[in-house]
Regions:
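Calmodulin-binding IQ motif helices
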Residues: 167
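Pyridoxal 5′-phosphate
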Residues: 1-164
Length: 167
């Protein structure tokens, strides 16, 4: 993959060619095609999805569900497993809330690494009265200590949450 060709699809790099953008979980940069598609939607097609009983709403609902199917196919999963959220933070909050209500029992344990982003720590601490948070340390290279992880997994472990990016 040629990084220059990829960067050329993002308008922001025209004025900021040396920009290194690492805040994608909160606010992703947009490629030209996405900006054009969004503009077209707001200009020509905008309607409430799954809410209206009129042509614009039906067409946009179909596009929305077609997108869900494409994501599901790409991930080789069912469309029922795909939930669209506005940010990684919202997704983490949703998962923590749902798990605390349906899947977590008193005294269950969740293993969280010291590398977690703040947005991935707060939701679990909010439900800590029900569960126990087990911190996962780092090795001498400041990487996740997988040997320690194996030692911490036990019959009470319900979830292991290790972020793969910290931006």
């Amino acid at each position: 993959m040629n990084i220059s060709n990829l960067k050329s699809r993002f308008p922001v790099f025209k004025k900021n060619p040396n920009l290194v953008f690492l805040d994608t979980a909160a606010s992703a940069l947009k490629v030209d095609e996405m900006i054009e598609a969004t503009n077209n939607c707001y200009t020509n097609e905008y309607a409430n999805i799954h809410r209206g009983n009129y042509e614009l709403s039906s067409k946009l609902t179909k596009k929305f569900e077609d997108a869900r199917k494409k994501v599901a196919d790409y991930l080789n999963t069912s469309e029922n497993n795909i939930i669209f959220v506005k940010s990684a933070t919202e997704g983490i909050n949703l998962i923590a809330s749902c798990m605390s209500k349906r899947f977590l029992e008193d005294d269950d344990e969740i293993i969280l690494s010291y590398l977690e982003h703040h947005a991935n720590l707060i939701p679990w601490h909010l439900i800590e009265k029900k569960i126990k948070i087990i911190p996962l340390g780092l090795n001498e290279n400041s990487e996740i200590n997988y040997d320690e992880l194996n030692d911490k997994i036990n019959s009470k472990t319900n979830l292991i949450k290790i972020g793969r990016a910290h931006v």
